[in-house]
C-alpha cells in the first residue's frame, strides 16, 4: 500500500479531523497531503464485495464534501483476501460525477502513490500518469507469482507461458471475477487480443495463439490461484503501464526468471533492460534503419531500438518505416511468443520475429546484407553453437559499414581457443570498442562474465585505427540480500558520453576505467579484453595497508579452520637471493620481480590426510582447501601463490599447490631478497588488480608475468615476525576455545 502523505486510520481520523460531518462513522483510511485530506480508502475482506468498498468510499467523500470544510476527489475501494488476491478500484470526482481514474487510456488498478495523486489533482480531469514500477517492485511481484505457480504445481518450463497469456488477456480487457471458466476466459481474451492485431499475419496469429493457450492438462490446477496472479499484475497497474513506453513484459519476465523459485533451472538468461538500452544508445538508431537480433529472447534489444525509433518519428511515413524496421529469431516457442507480444504491446510493431534458429542455412541467407544495426546476446556455452558463430552470423546480416553491438561471454575475447577467430575477425571487420560488464550482471540467474563488443561490418580493420576499451563495474545496480537493486555511482552515462566522444574523433583522457589503444597491438589474435589494457590505479599507503590487513586476516582464518597447519610453518620460507635487492619505485612486469611457476600436485582427493597445506583456488582460507600427508608429495619453493582468479596469498609454511586442470595455482619465487613487509607490498599490488581475472579470463602464467607492479618507494628493513604472530594467534585461539 502506497502511503504517499499522512496516512491515517479510523481513530487517527477522528483525532485529526473531528469536524468531517460523518457523525460516529469513519472510513478505514484517509490519506492527506500537506495536512489536507485528499483520498478516502474503504476495504472489504471478501473479493465479491468490491462494489461495496468503492461505493462506501465515494459516499464518505460526498458527505465530507457537503460539509464544505474539505474537498476530497479521490475514492479507493479495496476488496479481497490473501488466498484469492485483491481488487482495487480508484475513482475520481470530475465535475460532480465519479469516474474511473485513468492513465494511458486504462483504469488505474492499484492504490495510487503520492506522485500519482498529485498528478491527478493537478490535471483535475480524472487522469494521472502512473509511476512505472521500480526494479524492487517488479522483483517482489515476480517472486510472488513464481511462488504461486510453484504451489499450483505448474511445471517450471511452462510457467513463463502463464505470464505471457495472462498479461495479453489483461491487455485486452478486465477479467470477470465471477466467471466459472477462468482459464477459458483468459484464453478467449488472449485470442481476441492477438486476432485484433493488424500487424500479424494469419499464420503468425495462429502460431501465437497455439503457443500461448493454457490447456487443462498442463494448467488445470492453476484455476484456484489465477485471481491472485491477476491481482499481483494489477497491483503494478499492468494495463496502464503496457500503454506507456515501459517494457513491462520484458522487465517482469526478466525478474520472474531471475528471482522466481526454480525458474533459473530453465537455463534462459536475458539481457537486463538497462543494458539493452545502453547498447542501443552506444550506436544509435535512425528512421529507415533495419535492425536485427538473431537471438532475441523476449525482445529486449528490439524493444529498446523500437522505442528509440519512435522518439525520432514525427509523421505517418516514419511510423510505416518503423513497422518494417525490426527483425529477430528465437528457437524457444514460448520465448518467441513473448517477444512477438512485446512488440505488439509497443503499439506499432509488425513483429518480424521468427521461431527458428538463426544459424540454419535458410534463415541465415534470408537476412544476409540487409541490416544497418545488429544486436546480440547469444546463448552462453551452448554445445555445438559457440558464441563466435552467432557473432559471425550477425556480421553477415549487416550491410557494409553497418554496426554491431553484442553482449558476449568474455572468454571468446580472451582464450587461446578463439585466437584464430579474433585474428580473422579484424581482417574482415573493424573492431570499434570493447566494454567489460560487471561480474554480477546476471545474478542470481547466471554467473556468466560478459563484455560488450562494438564493431563495423565488412570494413577490414584500418592499420592506424584506435579501439575504445572500457571497464563498466557499476551499472547502477548492486547485489543486496539475494537481489540486484538500484544503487548510486552508475557509470553508464559517463561511459556513453566518452564513447560518443571517441566515435566523433574527440580526445579521450586515459583513466582507471577507459583507455584508447592502437589496433596494431591486437594483431595476430591478441586479446580483445579491456582487462588486459586498462591501466591500474596507483596505490597509496592507505590502499596498501587495507589490502595487507586482508592478507593477514586470510592467514588468521586459515589457522582458525586448520589449527594443525602451524606445524608446517617454515622459518626459512622467504630466504631467496640474500644479497640482491629490487629496484625502488619501479613499475614493471611481474616477471621483473618474480619467477612464475605452476603448481604440480594432483587433485586433493589423490592424497591422504596430514598437516601439509594443499593450496587451490579457494578464497576463504588463503587458498588452503585441505591438509595432506608429507609422504610422496612435491613441496613448492615460492612463498606467494596466485589463484586462477588472481588472488595472491602469502604462504609461510611448507605447502603444495594444485597443478592440474583449469584452476591451477601459480607460485611466485622472488628474484630478490625481500622482507615480509615487502612481500605484503607486492601481494597488495597483485590483489588490487583482481578485477583483471575471472573465470572467463584466468590468471594463467602468460598473463601473470605481464601484470604491471610497482615496487615500494623505500626498503622496509624493519620487519614483522610473521611466524611468531601466527604462532601466538594459534595459542590465543586455543585459550579462547577453552570452556571453563
Where are these regions (language model features)?
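Nucleic-acid nuclease catalytic cores
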Residues: 48-97
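Long recognition/docking surfaces used for binding and targeting
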Residues: 162-260
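Active-site metal-binding core of divalent-cation-utilizing nuclease and nuclease-like domains
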Residues: 2-35
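Conserved S-adenosyl-L-methionine
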Residues: 266-384, 388-389, 396, 401, ...
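A conserved structural/catalytic subdomain of Rossmann-like adenosyl-cofactor enzymes
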Residues: 32, 46, 105-117, 355, ...
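A short glycine-rich beta-alpha junction/loop motif
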Residues: 453, 658-666, 696-718
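Conserved catalytic cores of phosphodiester-cleaving nucleases, focusing on short active-site segments
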Residues: 29-31, 35-46, 60
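A short beta-sheet element
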Residues: 627-685
